[in-house]
Amino acid sequence: MTEYLFTSESVSEGHPDKIADQISDALLDEIIKQDLKARVACETYVKTGMVLIGGEITTTAWVDVEEITRNTINNIGYINSETGFDANSCAVLSTIGKQSPDITQGVDRCNPLEQGAGDQGIIFGYATNETEVLMPAPITYAHLLVKKQSELRKKNILHWLRPDAKSQVTFKYKNGRIIGIDTVVFSTQHKESITQDVLKEAVMEEIIKPVLPNKWLTKNTKFFINPTGRFVIGGPMGDCGLTGRKIIVDTYGGMSRHGGGAFSGKDPSKVDRSAAYAARYVAKNIVAAGLADRCEIQLSYAIGIAEPTSIMIETFRTGKISNKSLINLVRNIFDLRPYGLIEMLDLLRPIYLNTAVYGHFGREEFPWEKLDKVDELLQ
């Protein structure tokens, strides 16, 4: 019998890297609203009192970069100097250029179905039946903890909470099945006036206990709440933030491999993003169909080429049919060409700001989470 621990972390919308992701995706959404043919690669850097936006954007749209940036920061909750960052007074700088025409000639085609990939890349998708949303439990519950913190903060139930927060959950497994939660780490930015005793009790009673299933909490579960004892300075004042620096938080919490490409700020012609969504869609439908308990898929692409250069599936000895048979099913059922997967998942819509926090996967509001291929896989 094999026992092991597995840990995943998440961060809140007020974490500096997530501020950057949200700004990049807010700008992407506004561009897509106006121009479905836009090519967007938008990067954001945040530090005390400043936001720097760069990248390559080719579009007929006009967007107010400064207004969108300030509104995004304001919605997160950085509304005055007390929080360490002020949406109204921070500097907003833009160094946006246009996409290279060398890339454009490899991507755009007269026949949309022959649209080439926007870059080379390797992409992974994953699903497991250990939770109802077919996601790994550690990342699922890490997300739920910081999401709960945000809800309590925005409803002013815990008035001393500030936007920046982090969670980390360690699950204990036996023979591949969850048998308990070993360790919970939760750190939240707070007002200076709150005492640590009050903070720790409130976090335990209002955040941790309502979120984590009681069946997995034992007398041996360890809890570390604001373990440094103080978290007043947070957000961009505490650390600089960059788009695309939380790629494991965005995906499967480390339980699946990652190709290295970030998501936020990229339009769907970038397979780093769109093919990762398609790979999750494929893996989730395979698991939902009962063809495997766990499924990881790797896709690869070449710039300017429509068809994937490779498809690999691994089911970790849980597959009900061979991996080769699964690959054949995937090739026959799913259109994994760049234009095909954009159409399949209806990706040319302003849906990306909501993906930028609390994970891109395991959330039913997103089209790559639908289970409409299960019956076809079983035929």
Swiss-Prot record:
Cofactor(s) named in the record: Mg(2+); K(+)
Main location: cytoplasm
Catalyzed reaction equations: L-methionine + ATP + H2O = S-adenosyl-L-methionine + phosphate + diphosphate
Binding site for Mg(2+): 17
This protein's UniProt keywords: ATP-binding, Cytoplasm, Magnesium, Metal-binding, Nucleotide-binding, One-carbon metabolism, Potassium, Transferase
GO molecular function: ATP binding; magnesium ion binding; methionine adenosyltransferase activity
Record GO biological process: one-carbon metabolic process; S-adenosylmethionine biosynthetic process
Pfam families membership: S-AdoMet_synt_C (PF02773), S-AdoMet_synt_M (PF02772), S-AdoMet_synt_N (PF00438)
List of residues binding K(+): 43
Positions that bind ATP: 15, 164-166, 230-231, 239, 245-246, 262, 266
Residues binding L-methionine: 56, 99, 239, 270
Localization: Cytoplasm
Cellular component terms (Gene Ontology): cytoplasm
The enzyme's E.C. designation: 2.5.1.6
Enzyme class: transferase
Region (Flexible loop): 99-109
Biological function: Catalyzes the formation of S-adenosylmethionine (AdoMet) from methionine and ATP. The overall synthetic reaction is composed of two sequential steps, AdoMet formation and the subsequent tripolyphosphate hydrolysis which occurs prior to release of AdoMet from the enzyme.
Similarity comment: family membership: Belongs to the AdoMet synthase family.
Protein name: S-adenosylmethionine synthase
Species this protein is from: Buchnera aphidicola subsp. Schizaphis graminum (strain Sg)
